[in-house]
């Protein structure tokens, strides 16, 4: 494992995952890999173990997901992995740690309220493994009340990442959307792409937001 991107959703994790892959750190395990690889039940098990009692997951347990087929992912980003900053930093001590954050906390909150939160509420597939996984992290991360608890979760999570990195004496890059290639490449010790290579701008939620706008 080379890189752990432990920021919350809607902090530029998808763009950063694509940037890392362009830099040769590939593959990156992102939220979209969960359904594609039928990992929802395993992540649900991990959440239940963390919040409902059990032995914390370590490298062996995470490798059931991230090392499937004997080929470990080179990095990870976004939920559900980011729910486990302390456990992942402990499990993969060799990995660089990046915390993606938004310049404006309120804009992050608003972005969540226009994407992930209504998507869960409007999901018609409530018997699916992916829905049950989402229900678990909505329950345990913000007590099923993001408008009330979301901002506190954002602050608590970011501090937990900082503290976990500090306990392992690991360098931490706090990366904000718009910072571009230079600080990322410097942190990872990699050459910066040519000036004509744009930093990725990716957003899996654009279609969802467009459909909501059309219905309004």
Predicted regions and their residues:
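Short, well-ordered alpha-helical microsegments
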Residues: 13, 81-86, 105, 180-184
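Conserved nucleotide-sensing/catalytic segment adjacent to the nucleotide-binding pocket
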Residues: 45-88
């Amino acid at each position: 494992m080379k890189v752990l991107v432990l920021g919350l959703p809607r902090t530029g994790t998808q763009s950063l995952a694509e940037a890392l892959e362009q830099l040769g750190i590939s593959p990156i395990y992102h939220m979209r890999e969960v359904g594609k690889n039928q990992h929802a039940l395993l992540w649900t098990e991990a959440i239940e173990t963390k919040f409902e009692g059990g032995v914390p997951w370590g490298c062996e347990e995470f490798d059931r997901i991230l090392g499937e087929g004997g080929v470990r992912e080179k990095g990870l980003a976004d939920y559900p992995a980011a729910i486990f900053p302390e456990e992942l930093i402990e499990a993969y001590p060799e990995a660089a740690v990046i915390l993606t954050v938004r310049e404006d906390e309120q804009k992050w909150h608003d972005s969540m309220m226009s994407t992930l939160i209504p998507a869960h509420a409007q999901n018609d597939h409530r018997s699916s493994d992916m829905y049950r996984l989402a229900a678990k992290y909505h329950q345990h991360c913000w007590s099923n009340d993001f408008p009330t608890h979301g901002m506190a979760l954002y602050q608590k999570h970011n501090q937990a990442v900082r503290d976990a990195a500090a306990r392992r004496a690991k360098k931490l890059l706090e990366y904000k959307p718009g910072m571009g290639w230079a600080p990322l490449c410097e942190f990872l010790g990699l050459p910066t792409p040519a000036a004509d290579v744009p930093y990725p701008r990716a957003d899996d939620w654009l279609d969802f937001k467009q459909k909501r706008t059309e219905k309004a």
